[in-house]
Amino acid sequence: MSEKKYTFETEVDKLLHLVIHSLYSNREIFLRELVSNSSDAIEKLRYESISNAALNEDDTDYAIRIDFDKDAKTITVSDNGIGMTEEEVIENLGTIAKSGTKKFLESLTGDKSKDNELIGQFGVGFYSSFIVADKVTVRTRKAGQDKSQATKWVSDAQNGFTVETITKEKRGTEVILHIKKEHLDLLEYHVLKGLVNKYSDCINTPIQMKKVEYDKDGKQTVKDEYETVNNTKAIWLRSKDEVTDEEYQEFYKYISHDFADALMWIHNKVEGNLEYNSLLYIPQNKPFDFWNRDKDYGLSLYVRRVFIMENKELLPPYLRFVKGVIDSADLPLNVSREILQHNKVIDKIKKAITTKILSELKKLASKDKEKYQKFWDSFGQVLKEGVSDDYSNKEKIAGLLRFATTQSGDSKQTVSLADYISRMKEGQDTIYYITSDSYKAAANNPQLEAFKKKGIEVILMTDRIDEWMMSTLTEFDGKHMKSIIKGDIDLDKFETPENKEKFEKEAKDFEKVLKEIKEVLKDKVEDVRLSKRLTDSPSCVVVNDYGMSLHMQKMMEEAGQSFMPGMGMKPILELNAEHNLVQKLKNEADTEIFADLSELLLLQAMFVEGAKIEDPMAFVKLVNKYIR
């Protein structure tokens, strides 16, 4: 059959250009990526043949083979895995199905070191072949297909690709790389074997190369007989003492396609009523598309060394950054995704590994603060989801949280709740916090004034998830959590008797004017009262204890969500009785000026809080009216 010509989709063209011009210094990854693809193909066949043995075609000696030919200047990576149909070849090799590709390409900066890291997080897979090859040929036949229905794919990465139907005796895929002249040093047994041992030594499938013998003069002879060149015992089944740090790191890179080392790993063997082996990794950095809701996550589930699937049921969503492998002996080989969603063994494993991960993070936070800070900076926001999502582990997760505070000096989130409690003022039984859009907005919020004056530390929460998190985190270690922008604030125990008496006198003096201000503002406020929060600013707005904060209201509006009735939508206006503007208002006889100043005090407080102002132009005109 004649060959058909195709063009790459735009994203592939761009990615190929990046691979060829940006990753030449990381050329070794090509073999890791091709071996990984072959391993995946074999694992898929191993799984599908459980229910359809005919797919094996009487060949169950699964293996990956690596051959090289110095004369032809080629390296061939072949497998007897599941193979591909013509449609799958076009889909898998001509397009990038991975979501977020466009965003990834747009995020590249032109800085090679930064871009290499991004490319490593994205994973280039098969296309890494073009780092070392100027032409790639793929020959493949899907298991169960007729021998005459195989497919050949050819590309030089410059002019699209061609596809034609061929005959192929054995199922599976072979990738033939026509090596560029600057990479001909790869065409050596010891070089290729070294790359296998470096990057792919611990995979489950035998990797074979033809034996090489040397005579007394060191002359090399390549035999026709193949030998296995990798350690085929799965790394997660080996004893911790048998595995080096380098092997752990290379296996992480193999399963994650990350260029960077893992931050930490957790290798565990569980025996008893429930038996499984696990090897879990926490990356150093979050991938570029980490917040993409369509992105799949999950651990690789094996049953007695047979790969079953990537399964998100093994992890709660707030631990979706964890990579790794679970190998269970307590599940059937023919288990389906639907069965796993309601499987007691899976539920027990999930509970156990969640507990283990949180325990190891606690140890890390205690033993290596710098390393834990690296983890927190990358994954702290997603860990916060667990406070609301995982009630049984809420206290453990809360202990792992880190925040900026009024005493930490900058926006870096380094303070734990235990740290906060350890330096609470004598007599303080409440953990105070404020939520806001940014560190500066939080740190300069007028509602902090009384706390700063009294030396009471306040946690500054600026992540979007913080409002949701704090709706369920109401206490920690027996201490009540209190938002300083909600309800009344009782700091009387830190006041002198003179100041208490002074405030009571001011409250009586302002009783009449507060009612008049409320009448002027009508339904714009729930109440008007004197503030115990303010020392320098004239006004601020709060909501009642059970109402939705103005910050939360703003976020919901931005997300296009409507409000349920009775959620405390109207703000409470608080005034600083000692401020000149408030004193002027108290003594103002002109009703128009009184109304204007009342409105101005409300609007400027709303503005500082980042709340929505319905008519910004009216606010500006009001300010301009009284500028002298």
From Swiss-Prot:
GO function terms (MF aspect) = ATP binding; ATP hydrolysis activity; ATP-dependent protein folding chaperone; unfolded protein binding
* InterPro entries xrefs: HATPase_C_sf, Heat_shock_protein_90_CS, HSP90_C, Hsp90_fam, Hsp90_N, Ribosomal_Su5_D2-typ_SF
Q: Which domain of life is it from?
A: Bacteria
Q: Report residue spans for region: B.
A: 338-554
The UniProt keyword set, sorted, is:
ATP-binding, Chaperone, Cytoplasm, Nucleotide-binding, Stress response
Q: Where is this region: C?
A: 555-628
- GO CC terms in record: cytoplasm
**UniProt subcellular location:** Cytoplasm
Annotated region (A), positions in chain: 1-337
Which range is the signal sequence, renumbered to this chain?
Answer: none
As for family, the record states: Belongs to the heat shock protein 90 family.
Q: What does this protein do?
A: Molecular chaperone. Has ATPase activity.
Q: How does it assemble?
A: Homodimer.
Please identify the protein, giving its name as recorded.
Chaperone protein HtpG
What organism does the UniProt record list as the source?
Francisella tularensis subsp. tularensis (strain WY96-3418)
